[in-house]
């Protein structure tokens, strides 16, 4: 396993992190015992960055991490997010959300608490509500670091500029066919010593043969995906998962990304991605070619 430093927190974290959406039944039913096996397999392989959220399975993902981490809590860097979708981003709701997460996770502290889905609130509401609550929770020792999560980079930038945020998690913005984090956004995260977490380097499944169910009828999106894939066909390897390895290696070896998240519902899927975490990735010239090919071209809105 390869490790990196999570920005200004100074913590050493695995370059490959385990995302908790799949084991929270977000993409289909995963038996509880199977979820435990996935979590234990991750820890046994040296993965110490575990990512979940109150929203995933309406708390089920957190509950499963809580069960699986009995006796192993000190081995991992445990992260979650607040608040649940559809609830306000105010101070009281945030406090209640984090307290509920602590109970489900069966722990008395969270290593990293993150504002979830920043696009669904406003900067002022979040700063006076969620972020204010996070800062008080940090003073109380219930959280150790504070982050923000979202897909719209322009929404995330003002939070980074406050100086009160330690990490930023975004998704589908640093992948083979959408490189929009490259350039100004990475310059901003470097300037503020952000720990950058990259979610969904496979684009919610569009870099595989099985896009996420909620994308399978978006014909315009899938047509654009096919067009972009054709432009990088030389990277595709034989077999049904031809873009998976180059996509994972592209993210795992980016100097500006501390952690790349993988969602796994079965241990075998996790092991496949662990095999790519050996420090081998595209050359500087190959990376530059990708950045030039899709510069400024967002795939997802």
Predicted features and spans:
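N-terminal binding-site loop/beta-alpha segment at the start of enzyme catalytic domains
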Residues: 1-76
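Conserved, mostly hydrophobic/aromatic
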Residues: 6, 18, 35, 50, ...
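Structural preference for beta-strand elements that scaffold enzyme active sites
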Residues: 13-17, 48-49, 75-81, 109-114, ...
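Acidic-and-aromatic substrate-binding clefts and catalytic sites of carbohydrate-active enzymes
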Residues: 28-29, 53-62, 85-90, 121-124, ...
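Structural motif
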Residues: 41, 45, 104-105, 141, ...
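Structural motif corresponding to the early beta-alpha repeats
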Residues: 56, 71, 75-92, 117
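Distinct, well-ordered alpha-helical segments
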Residues: 61-70, 90-102, 106, 123-131, ...
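Beta/alpha (TIM)-barrel catalytic core signal, keyed to glycine-rich beta->alpha loops juxtaposed to Asp/Glu
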Residues: 118-301
């Amino acid at each position: 396993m390869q490790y990196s430093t999570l920005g200004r927190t100074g913590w050493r974290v695995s370059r490959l992190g385990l995302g908790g959406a799949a084991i929270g039944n977000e993409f289909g039913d995963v038996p509880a015992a199977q979820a435990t096996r996935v979590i234990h397999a991750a820890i046994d392989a040296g993965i110490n960055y575990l990512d979940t959220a109150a929203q995933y399975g309406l708390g089920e993902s957190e509950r499963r991490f809580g069960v699986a981490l009995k006796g192993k809590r000190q081995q991992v860097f445990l992260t979650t997010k607040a608040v649940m979708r559809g609830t306000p981003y105010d101070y009281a709701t945030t406090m209640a959300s984090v307290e509920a997460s602590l109970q489900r996770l069966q722990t008395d502290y969270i290593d990293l608490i993150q504002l979830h889905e920043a696009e669904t609130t406003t900067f002022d509401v979040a700063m006076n509500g969620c972020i204010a609550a996070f800062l008080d929770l940090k003073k109380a020792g219930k959280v150790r670091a504070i982050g923000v999560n979202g897909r719209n980079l322009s929404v995330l930038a003002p939070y980074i500029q406050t100086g009160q945020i330690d990490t930023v998690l975004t998704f589908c913005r640093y992948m083979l066919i959408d490189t929009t984090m490259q350039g100004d956004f990475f310059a901003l995260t470097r300037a503020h010593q952000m720990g950058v977490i990259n979610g969904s380097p496979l684009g919610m499944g569009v870099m595989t043969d099985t896009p996420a169910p909620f994308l399978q009828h978006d014909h315009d999106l899938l047509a654009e995906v096919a067009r972009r894939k054709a432009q990088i066909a030389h990277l595709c390897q034989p077999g049904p998962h031809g873009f998976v390895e180059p996509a994972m290696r592209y993210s795992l070896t980016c100097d500006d990304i501390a952690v790349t998240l993988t969602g796994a519902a079965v241990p075998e899927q996790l092991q496949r991605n662990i095999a790519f975490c050996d420090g081998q990735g595209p050359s500087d010239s190959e990376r530059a070619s990708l950045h030039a090919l899709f510069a400024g071209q967002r795939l997802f809105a």
